[in-house]
């Protein structure tokens, strides 16, 4: 394997501990290099968000565990499976959201460079059909449980509002811990933007028009010069203090410091919305061309490490360089610098 560091995402209950164990194991065996072999990422993917119970909502009437489980899934899935008890019976007992956030916080504290991910919104996916006895007998035991593994899809989807609740809690944790986030977004770019907008409300930058900038310079007795340098004209407003669990005791805004739009497949327009100056921070080809140079990351998005992963990383790096008109050595250096800045700040 040529890649020196793996950024490994957790997605569901079955792989949080596996990512943690892998990071511990490889970090213990690393050489004198200052870069860890693994950057672990902890989060709950939207495909599994139905397994999370929002215990921050109004308490429900006293129910048995079985009734509580049925009520939860009937509320968060669409269409409601209230009349499909066999389907509900085969779903796992939901995990309280507060428990997920507490566990993720502990894992982030263990790994100072860990990220939050993979999290997000997905309006397209459907839950797979329950396991049949034949499916169980024929499944590959080498695979981590919890994924689809070829099962047919059901008609059930997770309601967008429930996905938003699970996502928002994890983004708030990322802000609290000052960690970058890997975001999954399928047919939900507007929803992602709205969640982020809610989190950074009161922290927007003020973007002055040219006329107001000139008036401000004149009022300050400054010599009117070049109109460029927008970054110097952006003035943060609103309180920047929030409670933080970061070991250094610092307080951070209630939103992630850095976000990667993982495998972005939307159009250029939503990206322009995300990159608007007021924010505190072919179709794919158009997006790569439209992005600022320091906002491009590449990935293999592969479930195994090795030669195939290296080949995919090389292929996508070459494509990015070709689209941007970069000389290969320069482009690879840009992409490497972007990754280090995204992960380590």
Feature locations, PLM:
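Divalent metal-binding pocket/active-site signature
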Residues: 1, 86-277, 305
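Divalent metal-dependent hydrolysis catalytic cores, especially in the metallo-beta-lactamase
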Residues: 1-50, 114-115, 180, 258
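Active-site glycine- and acidic-residue-rich loops that bind
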Residues: 10-15, 48-53, 84-99, 281-286
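Conserved, mostly hydrophobic/aromatic
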Residues: 19, 40, 118, 174, ...
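Acidic (Asp/Glu)-rich catalytic clusters
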Residues: 20-37, 103-114, 274-279, 287-292
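Active-site gating loops and adjacent loop-to-helix segments of metal-dependent hydrolytic enzymes
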Residues: 44, 50-90, 125-156, 312-317
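Short acidic/histidine-rich active-site segments
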Residues: 294-309
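Mid-to-C-terminal alpha-helical segments outside catalytic/metal-binding sites
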Residues: 312-345
């Amino acid at each position: 394997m040529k890649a020196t560091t793996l950024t490994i995402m957790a997605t569901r209950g079955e792989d949080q501990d596996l990512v943690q164990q892998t990071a511990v194991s490889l970090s213990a065996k690393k050489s004198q290099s200052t870069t860890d072999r693994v950057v672990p990422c902890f989060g709950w993917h939207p495909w599994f968000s139905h397994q999370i119970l929002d215990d921050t909502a109004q308490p429900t009437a006293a129910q048995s565990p079985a009734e509580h489980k049925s009520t939860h899934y009937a509320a968060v899935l669409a269409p409601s499976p209230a009349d499909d008890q066999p389907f509900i019976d085969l779903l796992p007992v939901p995990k309280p959201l507060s428990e997920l956030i507490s566990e993720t916080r502990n894992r982030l504290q263990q790994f100072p460079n860990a990220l939050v991910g993979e999290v997000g919104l997905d309006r397209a996916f459907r839950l797979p059909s329950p396991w049949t006895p034949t499916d169980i007998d024929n499944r590959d035991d080498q695979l981590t449980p919890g994924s689809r593994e070829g099962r047919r899809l059901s008609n059930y989807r997770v309601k967008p509002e429930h996905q938003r609740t699970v996502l928002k809690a994890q983004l708030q944790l990322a802000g609290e811990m000052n960690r970058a986030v890997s975001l999954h977004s399928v047919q939900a770019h507007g929803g992602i933007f709205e969640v982020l907008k809610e989190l950074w409300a009161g922290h927007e930058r003020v973007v002055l028009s040219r006329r107001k900038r000139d008036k401000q310079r004149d009022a300050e007795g400054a010599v009117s010069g070049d109109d460029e340098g927008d970054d110097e004209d952006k003035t943060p407003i609103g309180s920047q203090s929030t409670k933080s669990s970061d070991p250094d005791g610092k307080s951070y805004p209630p939103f992630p410091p850095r976000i990667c739009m993982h495998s972005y497949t939307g159009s250029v327009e939503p990206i322009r919305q995300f990159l608007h100056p007021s924010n505190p921070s072919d179709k794919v080809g158009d997006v790569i061309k439209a992005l600022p140079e320091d906002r491009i990351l590449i990935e293999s998005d592969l479930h195994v490490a090795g030669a195939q992963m290296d080949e995919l990383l090389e292929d996508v790096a070459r494509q990015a360089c070709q689209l941007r008109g970069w000389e290969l050595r320069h482009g690879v250096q840009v992409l490497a610098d972007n990754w280090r800045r995204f992960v380590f700040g």
